[in-house]
């Protein structure tokens, strides 16, 4: 699976569990951390965990294993690191506080309108 395909598969997984404000940022031209960041907002800590678990399971089913998972105990922000793609699932407050969209403002947004269902 290419990094872009992996990012889009993560979007599908997050959307399937009603993740909100899903965004994909292409970051490969800015950093060696990852080619893509996938950002998603949840409405509760329970949903943060459910979104992260669903994303991890669906990508594992495609043969993609995260190299690192961070934040399960805290629940306000879970990060799934698939090397070329990093998935961030936030509570709204955490997403506003860390404001990765501002931090990575030079990243290229990826159009996911064909994947994400309107709320």
Descriptions of predicted regions:
Residues 1-24, 28-29, 43-50, 57-60, ...:
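Long, contiguous binding/interaction regions
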């Amino acid at each position: 699976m290419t990094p872009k395909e992996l990012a889009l598969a993560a979007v599908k997984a997050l959307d399937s569990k009603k993740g909100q404000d899903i965004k994909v940022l292409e970051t490969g031209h800015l950093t060696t951390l990852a080619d893509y960041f996938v950002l998603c907002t949840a409405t509760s800590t329970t949903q943060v965990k459910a979104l992260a678990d669903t994303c991890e399971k669906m990508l594992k089913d495609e043969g993609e294993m995260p190299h690192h998972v961070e934040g399960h105990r805290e629940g306000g922000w879970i990060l799934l690191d698939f090397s070329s793609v990093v998935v961030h699932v936030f509570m709204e407050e955490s997403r506003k506080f860390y404001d990765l969209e501002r931090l990575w403002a030079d990243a290229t947004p990826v159009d996911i309108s064909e994947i994400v269902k309107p709320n």
